[in-house]
Amino acid sequence: MFARILGLDVGTKTVGVSVSDLLGMTAQPVETIKIDSEAGELGFDRLAVLIKEYKPEKVVLGLPKHMNGDEGIRAEASRDYGTKLANKFGLEVAYQDERLTTAQAEKVLIDGGVRRKDRKKSIDKLAAVLILQNYLDAHALKL
């Protein structure tokens, strides 16, 4: 593979960002970008810097589905964000089911002894790591 993939956990106020290693085996946290989706501030200026730095071949966005698998308004917003991202940067965009990733991320932080105040700073980028790692695991090269 030898190319990185960015993972994004897109919310209404923040975008958690993660990146894969060059082999596409592991995901690492990068940062959390503050956005204001209602005002149309999608964090693309900061993403442009990260895309230039990491040179990903693809971006994976979390797709928030209902527990029964249906897609609702948040999934529609995620797909809209992905379309805008693809149009702006010319990158392939893929989607990964993100059900329970925020809950998983919170559990990891709690189990790690991270204080509530500090969890808020890390939860979105950790959710982005889980989204990207789930994608990498599902699309791993079979050796």
Swiss-Prot record:
Stated name of the protein: Putative pre-16S rRNA nuclease
Protein family membership: Belongs to the YqgF nuclease family.
BP terms from Gene Ontology: rRNA 5'-end processing
Cited function: Could be a nuclease involved in processing of the 5'-end of pre-16S rRNA.
Provenance organism: Lactococcus lactis subsp. cremoris (strain MG1363)
Keywords for the protein's UniProt record, in alphabetical order: Cytoplasm, Hydrolase, Nuclease, Ribosome biogenesis
Lineage of the species this protein comes from: Bacteria, Bacillati, Bacillota, Bacilli, Lactobacillales
UniProt cross-references to SUPFAM superfamilies, sorted A to Z: Ribonuclease H-like
Main localization (coarse): cytoplasm
Record GO cellular component, one term: cytosol
Subcellular location: Cytoplasm
